[in-house]
Amino acid sequence: MSERILVNCALPYANGPLHLGHIAGAYLAADIFVRFNRLNGNEVLFVSGSDEYGTPITITAEKNKTSPQNVADIYHREHEQTFKNLDIVFDIFTRTTDPEHVKDVDEFFINLLNKNYLEKRYMVSPYCKSTGKFMPDRYIHGTCPYCGFNDARGDQCDECGRTLDPIELINPRCTSSNEEPLFIATEHFFLRLDLLSDELLNYLNTRENWKPNVINFTRSIINEGLRPRPITRDIDWGVPIPLNGFEGKRIYVWFEALIGYITGARVYSKNIKDDDYWKKFWLDKNVKSYYFIGKDNIPFHTIIWPAMLIAHGDYNLPYNVPANEYLRFEGAQFSKSRGIGYTVNEALSLVNKNYLRYYMASIMPETGDSSFSLNELVSRVNSELIDKYGNFIYRVLGFISNRKINIKKCEPDSIINEFKRFFDEYSESIKNIKIKNGLQIWLEAVTLANNYFNSEAPWNINDHERLNQVLFTSLKISMYLTAMLYPYVPSASSEILSSLGFKTVNYKFDDMLGFDDFRPLKGEPPFKKLEIADKKINIDLMVGTVKYVNDHPNADNLYVLGVHADRDITIVSNIKKYLTPENLQGRRILLIRNVKPATIRGIKSEAIIIAVQHGERIIIPEVNADDGSRMKIDGFDFNGDIISMDEIKRYKFIVDKNELVLEYNNSRFIITENGKPLKINAPDGSSIVL
């Protein structure tokens, strides 16, 4: 019996390009889940959109000297296209600046106000003396009072996931001026979460299908005691409060953006000219609603949004909130604001969407953080998708086509029952949103398929009926494998289905698995070996210990340093006016080791020292690694070439959040030491001098 399913996907901020962390956190899993359910005959509404009123949009607008609306317009269009580039297809990708959204927010606000779930209170808000303005929560950074993370935002700590108020931060600072904000009392509306605690706990007790990390994190916060939470702010960019006397205030983004899920469903209904269609998904208690989000969005979707829905009274509560953990880039967290890691479109310039979707699904951070590696992507795509699955399909189709064999329907070999079992296990995994496990089951089925074809060796069969049965069975197996792959890699799977003779437009599992009218076409191999020419950064960062420091005999402003790295080397450096020999002697320092040796005033120099300049200060970062150790640059390997100073100028090093970052090819990459970001005690924005 078919089901009606609502799938809502976190609304990304319209302030910059989408990166792979976004895709792994929410969007790819949601798209796979939606495609799977539609193949099963379920009716699905798939909703997302741009979150356009958040503080990140105003920050981006200020940096680019433009309006928040212009920023939102640009990135809304870019996000729409990016999702299409990756075959992620929503029924509706809405906008929170849409007037329809403002109507929904107004209705929600008044509903909760009339039911006494909103109340006016005074609260202290951060005020920046330099700008003369009240500052949004995200403009305040400091130390998290719960976990001690020293770069928590005023609305949330990215490290432990706690929602915060700016006044809770230890040593708070305005991001614009780095000065301590004033906290001034102003009147605002508060959501009475404290009145909803018991109902929230009762609701949570019915959520047996949630991931343990999601349910435990949520329950622990509620058990600590929920407090009234402000839903308005002294800001200019946001949905106006629908009451007189509050013209200078706006409804805060964490409250209004959640209502965008309802707006998206309503706007979609208008688009298909069925104004009540959305009600089938929001008012019917039999509908299952899923919210695909990243780890940082858990409290908003498991506490605040259910509380808002309970208070409102008309709408379905979330059936499941399958939040994923973080995708990391060589140990560091992907970050849109900091430009760390690949954006989606940068990755798609290196690999096609089929390969990227496959690899991202295979490393999806469902129960713990996972790490993206370009080298691993190449390896897994080539060894699994191409060598195992693609090669099986090509061998079957090629054998039939080359021998011009006309396949007749017959009873397949009993091994087909194993593939039915694989399919059942695969289906159970995806129904329970174990996307990575579903792909692993598929890979086990691919292995069995190759074993069957090799062991039956059709090229050695002389009996025509037996040959037909083996090839018919192989084609049936091909349908099972391709049907199971389709939610993960839809474009390539569609082409392979066509080459098997399956021409149906609206795919359903029943049709694919029951198909037996095979008219196979050989065509080209379904996949080509993946090679990424530009997968190496040609720079060798190595650790060395300073053994001695001498004055240069022919230049008053230069030092001659003896350094032990992979071997004993000599370096000529111009840091003499900044640092004494005592500052350098015995220090473990970071070098660019593969620079072409140069003779400087009569002495050969074999490397370049990495130094940090901030104002008039020069800092030599010290590292805790053995001499000769190489630092890792996110996902890239040193290719062993010697480079000139002109080539080195293609690379730019900066300090960001006390981490050494390499800028290259319009991307930013974290330098890591033993799998962790290399920490440098220098202010953000410090430049690297060589």
UniProtKB/Swiss-Prot annotation:
Enzyme Commission code(s) on record: 6.1.1.10
Cofactor note: Binds 1 zinc ion per subunit.
Motif segment ('HIGH' region): 12-22
EC top class, as a word: ligase
PROSITE patterns, A to Z: AA_TRNA_LIGASE_I, TRBD
Catalytic activity, reaction form: tRNA(Met) + L-methionine + ATP = L-methionyl-tRNA(Met) + AMP + diphosphate
UniProt-listed InterPro entries: aa-tRNA-synth_I_CS (IPR001412), Met-tRNA_ligase_1 (IPR023458), Met-tRNA_synth (IPR014758), Methionyl/Leucyl_tRNA_Synth (IPR015413), MetRS_core (IPR033911), MetRS_Zn (IPR029038), NA-bd_OB-fold (IPR012340), Rossmann-like_a/b/a_fold (IPR014729)
Positions contributing to Zn(2+) binding: C144, C147, C157, C160
Short sequence motif named 'KMSKS' region, residue ranges: 333-337
Annotated positions binding ATP: K336
GO cellular component: cytosol
Description of how the protein assembles with itself and partners: Homodimer.
The protein's name: Methionine--tRNA ligase
Organism name: Picrophilus torridus (strain ATCC 700027 / DSM 9790 / JCM 10055 / NBRC 100828 / KAW 2/3)
